[in-house]
Curated annotation (Swiss-Prot):
Residues 383-404 are annotated as: Leucine-zipper. This is Protein ABSCISIC ACID-INSENSITIVE 5. GO terms for cellular component: nucleus. The lineage of its organism: Eukaryota, Viridiplantae, Streptophyta, Embryophyta, Tracheophyta. GO terms for biological process: abscisic acid-activated signaling pathway; negative regulation of seed germination; positive regulation of DNA-templated transcription; regulation of DNA-templated transcription; response to abscisic acid; response to gibberellin; response to salt stress; response to water deprivation. Residues 110-123, 167-176 have a biased composition (Gly residues).
């Protein structure tokens, strides 16, 4: 999230740089100190007027450019700036002068996103400049793979600025889905008694603020800082150090949003080792696996409390997913997560070809099913014909068997009759012979 302190720091650095340039009286740079982008380590900290004078040599105004042309010019300027810094670093490795163009070369390594530190001040000013350089390290990275939404591509820079101005500073800020950003309200709530700064004009706004408010990129939210429990003793040793907040796992009560400064139930370092600085410390919890914040809460019954888990070193966006976690999910599972960053999903060919392929596939499936049904029907008819033939053969065999059985019985009965008829005449002849014999021979 772009804080108000960073904005004020950028304005003070620009004013100090202009005063330093007038004091040195360099030739060709009296009208504007930022004629060369190589003197800035991050072009996103420049205002639009400074970037206009440094880049547009042909006199073309940014207001007449489309947003596509504006982003292309920013990327070209960033590449030139990086090339100049590399060349200057290569030249400075051989011979490093004590003071060059009013800049202190010892502070050039303050960070890629920071603004260069001017010399000519005391040691305290150098320390303050180093701190401001570290604060400015949250500049926008190169968005070379970013695709603008279709309505935003057709608009000019002046039209986008007018929409931002009408919206009261929020404009089209927020994510690509159209949700407006609430950074101004959060900053006012955090700063409390600070007086509201005046609304910057078009030329005074930095490139980073303009791109964020226009909706080209998202804001990176700051790390949540939970308030201490009022029921506990106000002991300074229970305060969590700032260095340990990056490795903090907290479970917050009363809200589904982990950025809400609620009550922390348990904190700890994922490595499992205690960290104590300055004689104080905090109670360690057992090692917890890095969790993913989904923005929603878990309720236990009607009156349950909502809880959320925060992972280390993963700034949570407005939709509840960290930028690094989204990239890891897309790279691990091969899923195109471009829709979360405003990019449209690439369609596999024209719609007509897709429909034609589907129709051909449906026709092939129908033909295959018809062939299968025809084969099944032919097999059934063949089985029925074989069954009828077997039935006829079975009937013929049964009839032949019955005829054979009848003939066999008939022959048996005929044989029995032929055996019983010759015995009767023999018995009669014997009886006759016995009756003719005389009883005595006289």
């Amino acid at each position: 999230m772009v804080t108000r302190e960073t904005k004020l720091t950028s304005e003070r650095e620009v004013e100090s740089s202009m005063a330093q340039a007038r004091h040195n009286g360099g030739g060709g740079g009296e009208n504007h100190p930022f004629t060369s982008l190589g003197r800035q380590s991050s072009i996103y900290s420049l205002t639009l007027d400074e970037f206009q004078h440094a880049l547009c040599e042909n006199g073309k105004n940014f207001g007449s450019m489309n947003m596509d042309e504006f982003l292309v010019s920013i990327w070209n300027a960033e590449e030139n700036n990086n090339n100049q810094q590399q060349a200057a670093a290569a030249a400075g490795s051989h011979s490093v002068p004590a003071n060059h163009n009013g800049f202190n070369n010892n502070n050039n390594n303050g960070g890629e996103g920071g603004v260069g530190v001017f010399s000519g001040g005391s040691r305290g000013n150098e320390d303050a400049n180093n701190k401001r350089g570290i604060a400015n390290e949250s500049s926008l990275p190169r968005q070379g793979s970013l695709t603008l939404p279709a309505p935003l591509c057709r608009k000019t820079v002046d039209e986008v600025w007018s929409e931002i101005h009408r919206g009261g500073g929020s404009g089209n800020g927020g994510d690509s889905n159209g949700r407006s950003s609430s950074s101004n309200g959060q900053n006012n709530a955090q700063n409390g008694g600070e007086t509201a700064a005046r609304q910057p004009t078009f030329g005074e706004m930095t490139l980073e603020d303009f791109l964020v408010k226009a909706g080209v990129v998202r804001e990176h939210p700051t790390n949540p800082k939970p308030n201490p429990n009022p029921n506990q003793n106000q002991n300074p040793s229970s305060v969590i150090p700032a260095a340990a907040q990056q490795q903090l796992y907290g479970v917050f009560q009363g809200t589904g949003d982990p950025s809400f400064p609620g009550q922390a139930m348990g904190v700890g370092d994922p490595s499992g080792y205690a960290k104590r600085t300055g004689g104080g410390g905090y109670q360690q919890a057992p090692p917890v696996q890095a969790g993913v914040c989904y923005g929603g809460g878990v309720g236990f019954g009607a009156g349950g409390q909502q809880m959320g888990m925060v992972g280390p070193l993963s700034p949570v966006s407005s939709d509840g997913l960290g930028h690094g976690q989204v990239d890891n999910i897309g790279g691990q599972y091969g899923v195109d997560m471009g829709g979360l960053r405003g990019r449209k999903r690439v369609v596999d060919g024209p719609v007509e070809k897709v429909v034609e392929r589907r129709q051909r596939r449906m026709i092939k499936n129908r033909e295959s099913a018809a062939r299968s049904r025809a084969r099944k029907q032919a097999y059934t008819v063949e089985l029925e014909a074989e069954l009828n033939q077997l039935k006829e053969e079975n009937a013929q065999l049964k009839h032949a068997l019955a005829e054979l059985e009848r003939k066999r019985k008939q022959q048996y009965f005929e044989s029995l009759k032929s055996r019983a008829q010759p015995k009767l005449p023999k018995s009669n002849g014997r009886l006759r012979t016995l009756m003719r014999n005389p009883s005595c021979p006289l």
